[in-house]
């Protein structure tokens, strides 16, 4: 929510317009108008208003952070094959879980139909628990169905952190979940930390971020999400201190898969989705695969690229 202008008190003096660093205010007919899409509730305008004509946005209802536990990875699968980025995130999530506490678990969320066999692969790449949601309506990805199902899971089990791959599915899916949970989402993260001391070490070695105000002995374990900003010219670290779950997307290939532990086991929680055909607005008639099997660039360790100047294959 944005700030509120009290019309009876506003004089149209434009002091608030000059104070706003986000260009979220303008004057029309001697009245301040708020662009809610730009307002970040920084409240810089409130301090400048001489007529007490601006009210701060009401604070959101406080969330009991202690009720949220464990790290979830959306184990994206397509046509019965888990995407590599999900396995990479299981490895990263396992590291974060150890840094939070000995009791924090790394869990995979598998959504689809007839995919129970994929749980074993999740265990072998680090998952301790798999939430398995199966239904014929979930055979192919649809925004409506997957969003409803994962939101139901989050409401029931309350994870502290949810990680998604920044694929075309993850980028469509994750923002909707975050909006419905009234929480934040950081896209295209390149580094994740929960321990302040580890974050300080990373920031000093790899960025120009100012860490002078941070205490390396701070016991808090909120996730610090680092990602490029302004076209990659700067690195920004984003936190989500007031809401849960904390959510991030990570591009394929950014994190490292842990070494596969053949035969590893864990707990499978079968979840019956509260889903009907009426919940899904998209009707998938057919899925046509490419006639020629292509190699996914997201799975490649090394990519060689060249223009016409190369001349020939040599």
Predicted regions and their residues:
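N-terminal glycine-rich FAD/FM-binding segment characteristic of electron-transfer flavoproteins
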Residues: 1-314
């Amino acid at each position: 929510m944005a700030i509120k202008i009290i019309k009876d008190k506003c004089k149209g003096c434009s002091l608030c317009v000059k104070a706003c660093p986000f260009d979220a205010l303008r004057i029309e007919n001697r009245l301040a108008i708020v662009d809610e899409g730009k307002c970040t509730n920084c409240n810089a305008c409130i301090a400048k208003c001489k007529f007490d004509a601006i009210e701060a946005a009401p604070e959101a209802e406080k969330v009991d952070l202690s009720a949220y536990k464990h790290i979830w990875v959306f184990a994206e699968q397509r046509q019965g094959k888990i995407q590599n980025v999900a396995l990479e995130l299981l490895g990263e999530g396992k590291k974060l879980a150890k840094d939070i506490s000995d009791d924090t678990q790394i869990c995979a969320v598998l959504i689809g139909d007839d995919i129970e066999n994929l749980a074993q692969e999740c265990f072998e790449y680090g998952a301790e628990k798999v939430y398995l949601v199966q239904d014929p309506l979930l055979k192919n990805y649809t925004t409506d169905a997957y969003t409803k199902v994962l939101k139901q899971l989050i409401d029931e089990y309350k994870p502290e952190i949810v990680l998604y791959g920044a694929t075309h599915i993850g980028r469509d899916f994750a923002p909707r979940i975050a909006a419905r949970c009234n929480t934040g989402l950081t896209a295209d993260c390149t580094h994740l930390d929960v321990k302040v001391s580890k974050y300080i070490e990373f920031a000093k070695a790899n960025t120009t971020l100012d860490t002078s105000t941070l205490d390396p002995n701070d016991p808090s374990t909120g996730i610090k999400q680092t990602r490029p900003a302004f076209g990659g010219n700067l690195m920004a670290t984003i936190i989500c201190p007031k809401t849960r779950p904390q959510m991030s997307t990570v591009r394929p290939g950014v994190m490292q898969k842990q070494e596969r532990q053949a035969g590893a086991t864990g707990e499978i929680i079968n979840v019956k989705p509260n889903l009907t055909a009426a919940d899904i607005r998209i009707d998938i008639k057919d899925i046509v695969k490419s006639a020629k099997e292509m190699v996914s660039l997201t799975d490649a360790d090394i990519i060689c690229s060249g223009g016409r100047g190369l001349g020939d294959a040599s």
